[in-house]
């Protein structure tokens, strides 16, 4: 796993027990999962809009910025649910080299 993701995972874990006024992440944890999910949704929309703007202008600066926000808030969400970024990387590794169609077909069917 990248050093950046490892360091960030450590910080996110440490913030779980911190006072809400000590950091942005601690305040998110204190507000609860619904607030964290709201932020993930907000950052998802902002990333989509930045991608549309980048496609039109060729300037990807805002897209990179918004994607970083989305990844960050997704990592906060995972940490809030007791998951480590390595679990996502492991899943990506598992999928590497698989056809997207084959991977999707192998998933359990929703009812």
Curated annotation (Swiss-Prot):
It comes from Ectopseudomonas mendocina (strain ymp) (Pseudomonas mendocina). Its EC number is 3.6.1.31. InterPro entries: HisE, PRib-ATP_PPHydrolase-like. The keyword Nucleotide-binding applies. Keywords: Amino-acid biosynthesis, ATP-binding, Cytoplasm, Histidine biosynthesis, Hydrolase, Nucleotide-binding. This is Phosphoribosyl-ATP pyrophosphatase. It is found in: Cytoplasm. It catalyses: 1-(5-phospho-beta-D-ribosyl)-ATP + H2O = 1-(5-phospho-beta-D-ribosyl)-5'-AMP + diphosphate + H(+). Belongs to the PRA-PH family. GO terms for biological process: L-histidine biosynthetic process. Pathway: Amino-acid biosynthesis; L-histidine biosynthesis; L-histidine from 5-phospho-alpha-D-ribose 1-diphosphate: step 2/9. The keyword Hydrolase applies. It is an enzyme of class 3 (hydrolase). GO terms for molecular function: ATP binding; phosphoribosyl-ATP diphosphatase activity. GO terms for cellular component: cytoplasm.
